[in-house]
């Protein structure tokens, strides 16, 4: 593993407005690299994470008694992980279980493991659970939108107002798996005392799963109607709230 991985975060915020409108806009980018060394692998199986987030808040004074608020936010994220056929906890657990006599690692661009015909117990090297096995990429798209209309009803009675709020939330995720295999070698002692490498397995190109592999989606609606009354009579504050909520 590498001693360090690159991480970056960037944000841009803009705010302003006029006498009848106020706005706030934000955009951000967060990236995080992986700790695994690639060695001579042609396909990048390392951990990688990218997230793009955005938000826009708009407030409109439609009239002196009417306020309209529009809020839009969301994020798009892509996460790549090594494809080992196991969960990530098991993947890192095998790194801890790796023993120094399990193999020589990467030698002249090839993965070399100990020969079980020579050693009674070879253990497992740290590369066995992920090296050359491909990767999986999960893309998630989250959207949150809410609208709020606040209308003062002082023409009926002072302190009376009505608020109508609606929200829409959605999340779509798609996981694509790319599998491959990579040959490994074991050292063999020849009769003349030299050492040769015996090959096991083959090198195969990436094979992607079905386009809809791991697809999921979810969405929900939220509606709220609230009648609010707040008024002060001398030293006394009187408040009342009637709310209807539909989810």
Predicted regions: what they are:
Residues 41-45, 85-96, 178-188, 194-195, ...:
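Flexible, surface-exposed loop regions and adjacent strand-edge segments
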Residues 39-44, 57, 130-136, 148-150, ...:
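Extracellular loop and loop/strand-boundary signature of outer-membrane beta-barrel proteins
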Residues 25, 70, 147, 162-166, ...:
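Membrane-embedded beta-strand positions of outer-membrane beta-barrel proteins
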